[in-house]
Amino acid sequence: MRKVKFFLFVITVCALFASCDKMTNNGNLDGMWQLISVSYNKTGGEDSIVNVKNERVYMNFQQKLGQITPGTFRTDSMGRYLLMRFEKKSGLLKLHDFYAFYETAGPLGTERHSEEKLLTDSATTLLQPFGIDGLFANFNILKLTGSSMILQSDYAKLVMRKF
């Protein structure tokens, strides 16, 4: 009987260590990032640099899902926050499939309803404050450490710090 209990204990411990743990290949990208500045690329002129540190814009990356918390740039058409899919491969970060997440309260705040809407208008300017022109973005990862990240696309350069 004692051997059976010990065997069951060993099996239980092994199952606990082997279950429900997903590892990502995102490295330092995973986590919450604060957008510090956006430099919009100008053709034939100087880049326009916008300091957005005090606007409370955050980007979160986990597994293959990203989230943008718009801070003071929030509008009704944007919703509470934006969700997106992303792919990170060999120095390139691709952002796509953006969703606006809406949350409304019922009478006297008793019920909460949430809804996600896929952004489909290819001419949207909704994402431009975050350095994204249109419905997708391809960023070259210029720098990615445990504390800072710099992304560069044809449209903008983003400087972020780990939060």
Where do the model's predicted regions map?
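Tryptophan-anchored aromatic micro-motifs
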Residues: 28-46
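C-terminal motif of bacterial Sec signal peptides marking the signal peptidase cleavage site
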Residues: 16-19
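Short, exposed beta-strand-loop hairpins at the edges of beta-sheets
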Residues: 138-157
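C-terminal/domain-terminus segments
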Residues: 85-87, 151-163
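Transition segment at domain starts
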Residues: 35-38, 48-61
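Bacterial N-terminal signal peptides that target proteins for export
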Residues: 1-8
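Contiguous, well-ordered beta-strand patches that form the walls/edges
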Residues: 39-45, 61-144
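Signal peptide cleavage region of secreted peptide precursors
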Residues: 21-24
